C-alpha cells in the first residue's frame, strides 16, 4: 500500500497469487461501492503496490485463470477470485460456485506469508465476506418473498383448497 510500507523496500518472497489477492482486496477496500474490477484495474493495482521491482509475468495469467475459482484449473487451482463477467473479477467469497477441481484450494493468503503491513487485509476480508453473506440473505428476492402470499390463504386451508380443486376428478 504503497500505504503499507516503504516503496524503497522490494519484497521478493510473496507468491504471485497472494500479490494478486492483495491488489484485489485493496481495490475492494478502497472502492466498497464496486462489485468487481476489470483485469486491467487489478494489474494496475499490482503495479502500483510495487511489491516487486517489476511486474512479474505471472500476474496477468493468475488474474485471468490461475486464481479464478469458477474456471477450470490450468494448471493453477486457487480460489481467490471469481469471474463475474468476461474480463471482470472480484474476490472469492464462501458460497461462491467454483470448478470442482478447485475443491479445497487456497482462497486467501496465509497472514504469515504476506508482507508486513498487509495482515490487516486478511481480517478485513473476514469481515467483508461476513457482511456480504448477510447482504445476500437480506437482498435475496426469494427470501424477501417469504410470507408474501399469506393473505391469499386466510379464508381457506391449503388442504381444503386442493380438495376443492380435485372435486369431480375421476
Please report, for each region that a protein language model flagged, where it lies by residue:
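Phospho-regulated, low-complexity intrinsically disordered regions of nuclear gene-regulatory
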Residues: 2-30, 53, 57-144, 162-164
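Alpha-helix C-capping/helix-to-loop hinge sites
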Residues: 26-31, 49, 148-152
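DNA-recognition alpha helix
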Residues: 23-27, 38-52
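Flexible coil/turn residues that form the inter-helical turn or adjacent wing/linker of helix-turn-helix
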Residues: 35
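Short hydrophobic/aromatic patches at helix-to-coil boundaries
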Residues: 167-170
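Short linear motifs in low-complexity, proline-biased tails and propeptides
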Residues: 152-163
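Generic secretory/membrane-interface signal
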Residues: 41, 77-80, 151-153
